[in-house]
Amino acid sequence: MSDKKSLMPLVGIPGEIKNRLNILDFVKNDKFFTLYVRALQVLQARDQSDYSSFFQLGGIHGLPYTEWAKAQPQLHLYKANYCTHGTVLFPTWHRAYESTWEQTLWEAAGTVAQRFTTSDQAEWIQAAKDLRQPFWDWGYWPNDPDFIGLPDQVIRDKQVEITDYNGTKIEVENPILHYKFHPIEPTFEGDFAQWQTTMRYPDVQKQENIEGMIAGIKAAAPGFREWTFNMLTKNYTWELFSNHGAVVGAHANSLEMVHNTVHFLIGRDPTLDPLVPGHMGSVPHAAFDPIFWMHHCNVDRLLALWQTMNYDVYVSEGMNREATMGLIPGQVLTEDSPLEPFYTKNQDPWQSDDLEDWETLGFSYPDFDPVKGKSKEEKSVYINDWVHKHYGFVTTQTENPALRLLSSFQRAKSDHETQYALYDWVIHATFRYYELNNSFSIIFYFDEGEGCTLESIIGTVDAFRGTTSENCANCARSQDLIAEGFVHLNYYIGCDIGQHADHEDDAVPLYEPTRVKEYLKKRKIGCKVVSAEGELTSLVVEIKGAPYYLPVGEARPKLDHEKPIVILDDIIHRVN
């Protein structure tokens, strides 16, 4: 048994396995929503020194860089966050983290339910037992320009309606919009030392710009659907899927890189230069924003989907690239590495190997309801098909054969009878992740001479960072970490030149290298690095076309090794 005793072990939620719900469905359930709001109020009101408080749970991810819930202090620890980024443990560490939050939320909801004095008190108590953290499915987009996947209760409403303990309807201040520090943490620096509450999408005056944030989410939605689809279907190994470290042979974003950009959807305006990050745009401060938990709930859901699709693949060996509170630089990481500061009821550290079956912790997702009790193989086939349907490109523009072809390729079920072949075009960016001291974005946009606007942005590759005077030494130790990200181009190619084909078969040549190079040169792609400091000298950018095909009877595209990957030069213009 470990000698590191935890005062708040992660034991999971007892009883029946219950689903974490999409936030759009969750808010329609009055009992769930009321209990969630009340539980947040309870956690946010707790003294910031209480390990079960909203502040302390958020602080596990970053500042104030203190030990969490340890019975005895541990000596010689790095002054750093606990969270693992850029390593093979990124998905599993955050699974344990999300579940620790969920367990604490669930306990608070149970206490809240006991306060109801109405005749249906038993129903409130049962609802509290069934309550799980909801997720924001930011990868889903139904081809609706006004769809953002978040209800007003999460992003707009300063007051929300809930049921009071006596059964009447009341309005209360919305605890999902912000966390109010009491007091502001003394180790916060810069703007974070001035903001009394968490800040989303700050403008040049350092004020919250919610309508700008919503416009940014809408503009990014089609790209996120394609990024999510490619992340789930083209990363066959744990090394490719798990983190943003550069890997030979990658052709789609990792789970972590897509996750980075979602942080920035809430945490920064990409059109501002220099960058003005809010809390969600800075690693040391991100988990203090209540939306963090919805975001990371979806990160875990995507991990569960990928696990089911690749049921014979799990955590592979990798190198720890930066110091954390629980890991040293250069340490070899495996599925048996401890996930500090999370301990079992037996006071042993949780390990990735313990977390492979997420139901161990008392939750699941609605996506798996149709295949309960099925074999791993049957679940894999079903989820593969479901991912194609849910995240594959869908279009109502049936007059555009190039988009119909793209839709056919991405939405084919495993029993399809046609073999599809298509070049997949991406912008590929590699860079030293710690070259700059804080978060930064690499932004790609059309019509370079016209300037960068939300409407012209094709996509971004984002370094989700955050440096303080206390942890800057970690960056020096991690200088050699090369990260990579991708921006997928086929949707834009299909939209713009697809009208030149009469049928889907005629559209295939439109994705061939010669036509694509001609098209992209005309679109004048600009690239700019937006940060709060200097130039990113390590950045290397290229456009790559990989020949993929979808065999008859399969739902996962395969790289055609008989054809070379094509590199297009002299297309992207670097803008200072």
Swiss-Prot record:
One of its GO terms (molecular function) is tyrosinase activity. The record marks G392, F393 as: Cleavage. Its EC number is 1.14.18.1. Substrate binds at H263. InterPro entries: Di-copper_centre_dom_sf (IPR008922), Tyrosinase/Hemocyanin (IPR050316), Tyrosinase_C (IPR041640), Tyrosinase_Cu-bd (IPR002227). The keyword Metal-binding applies. It comes from the Eukaryota. Signal peptide: none annotated. Belongs to the tyrosinase family. This is Polyphenol oxidase 3. The gene is PPO3.
